[in-house]
Amino acid sequence: VAPPQHLCGSHLVDALYLVCGDRGFFYNPKGIVEQCCHKPCNIFDLQNYCN
């Protein structure tokens, strides 16, 4: 498992595509930016945003 990291902007969107794949994801900028850009997040945090 990758260590928690700060993901912002296009890096965050790319990470969501990788983690969620065909399921897609719902993009809630306020929540995920707070969780993954301002603070580091991990792959499990990202999975919470998959559809």
Curated annotation (Swiss-Prot):
SUPFAM superfamilies: Insulin-like (SSF56994). It comes from the Eukaryota. GO terms for cellular component: extracellular space. GO terms for biological process: glucose metabolic process. It is found in: Secreted. GO terms for molecular function: hormone activity. SMART domains: IlGF (SM00078). InterPro entries: Insulin, Insulin-like, Insulin-like_sf, Insulin_CS, Insulin_family. Signal peptide: none annotated. Keywords: Carbohydrate metabolism, Disulfide bond, Glucose metabolism, Hormone, Secreted. Pfam families: Insulin. Disulfide bonds join C8-C37, C20-C50, C36-C41. Insulin decreases blood glucose concentration. It increases cell permeability to monosaccharides, amino acids and fatty acids. It accelerates glycolysis, the pentose phosphate cycle, and glycogen synthesis in liver. PANTHER family: INSULIN, INSULIN/INSULIN GROWTH FACTOR. Heterodimer of a B chain and an A chain linked by two disulfide bonds. Belongs to the insulin family. This is Insulin. The lineage of its organism: Eukaryota, Metazoa, Chordata, Craniata, Vertebrata.
